[in-house]
Amino acid sequence: MAKRKKLSVWSGIAIVSTAIVTNIVKKKSDKTTYKSVNINPIKKRKKGIYERYIKRVLDVICAVGAIIVFSPVYLGVAILVKFKLGSPILFTQDRPGLIGADGKETVFKMYKFRTMTDEKDENGNLLPDEVRLTKFGKWLRNTSLDELPEAFNILNGTMSVIGPRPQLVRDMVFMNEEQRMRHTAKPGLSGLAQVNGRNAISWEEKLN
């Protein structure tokens, strides 16, 4: 009986992991470059040996280890999201990534567990975020469990374990060239903003 229960748990984990991997691990060619008349090209900085080679290896090791260790958590959260919010389980959002060859930010799909409903008004427009955000969703955000799928962003090379947190694409028009230099480093799962106050700190403190 215990063996059957253990087998069913691992089968569930395998199913969820396969679904996540199928939707998340994509080629870098899937990224697009952000184009805007308000965004000027900036010069890419030269990277050292550590950033070019060693950091990537460490990122992959950490991401794979985290996915294996926390696989029961992935399964549990996925089931809860499905039960409380329905499908899809994952939420995807465009975020600015590394500066491309043309001096402009590439845009990648960042993955999170879904925290909001898809409720719409009578005209078919989504209701405000604060209305659609559920208590369960708030809990996921407060515990950062919604960010677990970002480990797969690390695997496909669009993010790193440590680096500047990616802002929203629409915020880029408000950044000066000095602030946009953050995009010469790969965006991270965690960075200075997270360990120094997270959402409690100001916009300027996050970017400078």
What are these regions, as identified by a protein language model?
Residues 52, 56, 71, 108, ...:
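Generic recognition of short, well-ordered alpha-helical interface segments
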Residues 78-82, 115-118, 138-141, 153, ...:
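Generic alpha-helical structural context detector
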Residues 1-12:
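Membrane-penetrating hydrophobic segments
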